[in-house]
């Protein structure tokens, strides 16, 4: 609802680099663990997979909007334009964006800490058997990491800079109203990066130093925990309201209409 379509496309563009980096990096980890995909069955292998570890750190930093990496330029731009709408909807969108950026950073570092730090938890694969991936798997990660680091800075002006609307987007995007050329206050610009930085020690404490705490918090409110862990039961709702009726409708047409 912000109307900043060029900013959204910019984030989609930068997002491609660091999200692909994390997906392929996850594949490298899965390869090292002989197809194990549960991060609860990993841990303590950052020295065994130094290149994969470093590259996934880059992807995580970019995803969370760490200052001066690609996600920092695009994600913060969306939040800034929401704030600059100057109305209740804009402030609400900016607040939700900041809060979700904070949560995103926590769960992203959860991935890193549970996968590479703490105790080794795999009973099927010995830690001596884990190994770094070959170059054929690492080179694509290196290429993507370059984009995850520099794509935001290099392409910022092209996507959302002054004049970019004229020579890059041209007539492909029609704005209902011009985007604000102002800048948010300094405190607002610093808020998201500060929360991103704060989330790192929080995630380390929760998922390395005091791993029982998340379980204790979940046990304090089991109904809410079950609701969230089951994704608001959206899959079940979708199955009941869309999938099953569609199957029955298809069966009806097959049996009684198609002959």
Where are these regions (language model features)?
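Hydrophobic, small-residue-rich alpha-helical packing segments that form membrane-like cores
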Residues: 1-84
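Interfacial and helix-entry/exit segments of alpha-helical transmembrane bundles
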Residues: 33-69, 91-100, 125-150, 225-226
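Divalent metal-coordination and catalytic microenvironments
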Residues: 15, 42, 71, 112, ...
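Aromatic-capped, Gly/Pro-kinked transmembrane alpha-helices
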Residues: 159-191, 205-259
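Hard-cation-handling environments
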Residues: 130-200
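Alpha-helical transmembrane segments and their membrane-interface junctions
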Residues: 61-77, 145-164, 242
């Amino acid at each position: 609802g912000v109307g900043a379509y060029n900013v959204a496309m910019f984030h989609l563009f930068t997002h491609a680099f660091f999200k692909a980096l994390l997906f392929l990096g996850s594949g490298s980890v899965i390869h090292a663990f002989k197809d194990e995909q549960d991060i609860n069955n990993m841990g303590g292998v950052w020295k065994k997979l130094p290149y994969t570890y470093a590259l996934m750190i880059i992807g995580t930093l970019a995803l969370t909007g760490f200052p001066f990496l690609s996600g920092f330029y695009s994600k913060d731009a969306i939040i800034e334009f929401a704030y600059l709408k100057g109305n209740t909807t804009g402030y609400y969108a900016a607040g939700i964006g900041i809060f979700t950026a904070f949560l995103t950073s926590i769960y992203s570092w959860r991935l890193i800490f549970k996968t590479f730090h703490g105790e080794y938890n795999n009973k099927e694969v010995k830690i001596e058997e884990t190994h770094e991936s070959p170059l054929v798997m690492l080179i694509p990660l290196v290429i993507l990491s370059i984009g995850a680091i520099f794509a935001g800075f290099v392409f910022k002006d092209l996507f959302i800079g002054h004049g970019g609307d004229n020579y890059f987007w041209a007539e492909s995007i029609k704005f209902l109203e011009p985007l604000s050329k102002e800048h948010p206050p300094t405190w607002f610009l610093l808020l998201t990066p500060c929360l991103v930085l704060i989330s790192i020690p929080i995630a380390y404490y929760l998922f390395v130093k005091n791993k029982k705490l998340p379980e204790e918090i979940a046990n304090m409110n089991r109904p809410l925990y079950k609701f969230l862990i089951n994704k608001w039961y959206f899959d079940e709702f979708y199955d009941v309201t869309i999938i099953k009726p569609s199957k029955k409708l298809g069966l009806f047409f097959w049996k009684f209409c198609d002959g």
